[in-house]
């Protein structure tokens, strides 16, 4: 079963943060990791198997391309995000800012990445789902608290018809 490695990495009920790269891959069928992202969003999060969290930084980032394409292009993306009952869109608050500042100071994350990861820490997710190679090494000392699951590590993944 192609999804087996993903199912082993993310246990039933574990809360997961979806990074911007996951959402972009989900929305863009031409992305190499689209089949994995689609499985994570449609089969794990949308089903309720794994509640998902998305930072407002990621929301902002995934709205840029649709806004550039057409004036109302982002409404489809917003509608999708708002229609997901098991997906929490998390605003940046003082705890997220504090966690992000720590990540910037100690692991030298970029400000956007620090805010995204900080959202995951503040909301106590078990896994950060991303396609960012650097996150695993930067967060290596935090594996007891949080793990990094990279989409690319689960390729090849068959596309759905």
What is each model feature region?
Residues 18, 53-54, 91, 111, ...:
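Short beta-strand scaffold positions
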Residues 58, 67, 84:
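Histidine/lysine/aspartate-rich catalytic loop segments that bind and position anionic ligands
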Residues 1-13, 117, 122-161:
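Acidic, PIN/NYN-like endoribonuclease modules and their adjacent C-terminal/linker elements
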Residues 1-54, 68-76, 151-161:
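Short, well-structured N-terminal submotif of metal-dependent ribonuclease cores
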Residues 48-52, 86-88, 124-127:
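Short active-site oxyanion
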Residues 22-23, 58, 96, 115-116, ...:
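Alpha-helix capping/helix-boundary segments
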Residues 77-99, 104-112, 135-161:
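Short acidic, glycine/proline-enriched helix-loop-strand junctions
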